Amino acid sequence: MSNKTRSQLMILCEDKAQLDFIKGYCKEAGWDNRAIISQDLCPAGSQSAEQWVRERFEKTLRTFRGKYGQGRSVVLLVMIDGDKFSVSERKKQLQQNVQCTAQEPVAIFVPKRNIQSWMAFLDGDFENEEQDYKQKYQRQSPNSKYGRNLRKFCLSSSPEKLPASLEDACKEWGRIDRL
């Protein structure tokens, strides 16, 4: 029995576009929707979604550690836009009050600018990570196809061919796959 058939997933992200992207990747990696025990995304229009994820992360991680940290095979997947911050700066902000270790089944994904940057790259319509592709991909559906494509891309590509945020994401997915 593979790790993925036993593992369950908790997802914390900004919006439905990110959620669909994560689900698409997970499906391609061997998880199905029944593996998702928790999906938490910012209520539309309530506040800055990036801020909401940052504020929610500490509580979610503590719940994850307390409820699932001992003996259960649960993976926590977090996605937050980088906006104008680098991947490392955004991760540092997120983990300001609580740190994740490399051995924990916690993965943090930070699309530079926003998830639409990754969509543009996967479509071959990409100039750089600083450009905002949100308008062009705002109504793109389903986003899950991009998650599936990223899985294939991570498995087949050299990291040096990827934008920095995608290189980091592929490393995070690889680390989770090895746990």
Predicted regions and their residues:
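Short hydrophobic beta-strand segments
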Residues: 10-12
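C-terminal accessory helical subdomains adjacent to catalytic cores in phosphodiester-
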Residues: 1-8, 17-45, 54-179
